[in-house]
Amino acid sequence: MKIDRARAQKAFADYAAHYNAADAKVKLKIDHTYRVAALCARIAQSLALPPEDVDLAWLSGILHDVGRFEQLRRYNTFIDAQSVSHAAMSVAVLFDEGRIRDYLDDAGADALLRTAVEWHSAFRLPEALDDRTRLFCQILRDADKIDILRVNVETPMEEIYNVSTAALRRSPVTPAVLDAFYAHHCVLH
């Protein structure tokens, strides 16, 4: 399958243009999307995947957060627990509304792309994934986490989480979070 990166990039830009890029949160997600796509391609190249698969990994990065824009418009937050699953919203926009065809005509990779987008923010991937799908899910998840770590270091808390640094520092840590931390477990909300 041949992926036209210019077409996909234009489709994403056209979609994002419906949202206010002057808003720091919208701009953050536009920039994040392009960085994640580039990181996906870089990871795929480092694994010596064929060029078509490098392009497919890149496309998964372009697609993964399209639901964030509508989440932000409706709820003014990036926090899924306070709104909706942005991954599920991305799947709805792309596959339920058919916007995936704006990015590519060939439906041959739809199942893989849908799965990668759907599971990119989940705590764990389903065990039943085939090896190829699991690989693309892992590439996208790794690229997304790499850039999110960068965002959390470089971007003020107020721009991301609707809370001031001072308020966050004053807020208590619950016993459940402390227990998970000391037990070296993931803190789930």
Predicted regions and their residues:
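All-alpha prenyltransferase/terpene-synthase fold signal
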Residues: Q9-A24, Q45, G98-R99, L104-G108, ...
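His-Asp-centered metal-binding catalytic motifs of divalent-metal-dependent phosphohydrolases/nucleases
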Residues: V54-I79, S90, A111-F123
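Short acidic (Asp/Glu) patches
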Residues: D96-D102, S121-A128
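Acidic/histidine metal-binding catalytic segments
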Residues: A48-L59, I100-E118, R132-I139
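Post-HEXXH active-site segment of zinc metalloproteases
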Residues: R73-A88, E158-N162
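Divalent metal-dependent phosphate-bond-processing catalytic cores, especially two-metal-ion Mg2+/Mn2+ enzymes
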Residues: K2-I3, K25-I30, Y34, A38, ...
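Active-site flanking loop/helix segments enriched in acidic
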Residues: Q9-R35, G67-D80
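An active-site-proximal "capping" alpha-helix that borders the catalytic cofactor pocket
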Residues: R35-I43, V84-R99
